[in-house]
Amino acid sequence: IQFHSQNLDKSKMHERLGYYMFRSFGVNTPRSNHALIYINGEYTGLFANTENIDGPYTNEHFDGGGGNLYKEVWPVNSEGSSREEEYFIGGLKTNEELSDVSKAIRFSNLLNDNENEALKDVVNKWIDKDIFLKTLVVDRRIANDDGFMHFYQEYGNYYENHNYFWYEFPDQDKFQLIPWDLDNAFENLIQNVNPVTPIKDKWYETSNNCKGFRFGQFNLKQKSAACDKIIGSYTDYIEDYNTLDQAFQNELYNMSNINSLIDRWSSQIRKAVDDASVLYGENEPSLQEWEYNICLLYTSPS
């Protein structure tokens, strides 16, 4: 587990609600709840108690684990070219002693070497289509704009995303994406509140002929996610996506369910929020600030 201070989230709900939505819709992500931390009997604060993504996590959630876990390494670069061995080794979070990234290199090379229908066949072979589409559905509904769908300019014509892991199945040619770090989710649902994270396009749209462009209050450069070889290959499945999206709204992402969850969870942490505000002053939201941000979650989903 890890304890996340949630300094960027004045509602203190983004991680718990976001991971709940992913997990409840069949996407393998960490469990998360709230924790009140005391050190030597003294109250330290309210934290998100979020399951850490590491070897024990993959052992627990992937049929015994054993496969490579990579943090923030995308199989091809933003120009669609394959990655080098050192790149994948640098992202390894399990099996570092062996550092056998040959399967990731093979996947990367196949993505590099193929286009159109052949590319789609490669992606479908290596990534479970239903799970990836479900991941897209939840990611876009909760506006996880600081995650794998946001390709920020790294330098020149190269763009990188972050806040995710890949799990490589040891006995199959398969990879599964695991979203991570959801504290900025939910912010841009109604309007672009965060000056850094907003994504211009819908997940299946492209802008500026797949070249970088400036967007948002800070005018930062980004690149459309659908220009990526993996994400772009799913744009042919928009009807499947829409079907899953409707199911997600019917089952989970609706005001009745969300309000019920927030009512229950906010009652659990109200006193802790107030106590933290008294303890840390301006470094923590006041009870009134917290209530205002909770109200935004009540009214945001659409």
Please place each PLM-identified region on the residue numbering.
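Middle-to-C-terminal accessory/interaction subdomains
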Residues: 101-150, 154-163, 171-301
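Short intrinsically disordered coil segments
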Residues: 1, 62-69, 182, 193-199
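Zn2+-dependent metallopeptidase catalytic core
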Residues: 13-27
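Internal "kinase-insert"/substrate-recognition segments embedded within catalytic cores
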Residues: 5-6, 24-30, 42-147, 176, ...
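Short, acidic/polar N-cap/turn motifs at the starts of alpha helices
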Residues: 32-34, 163
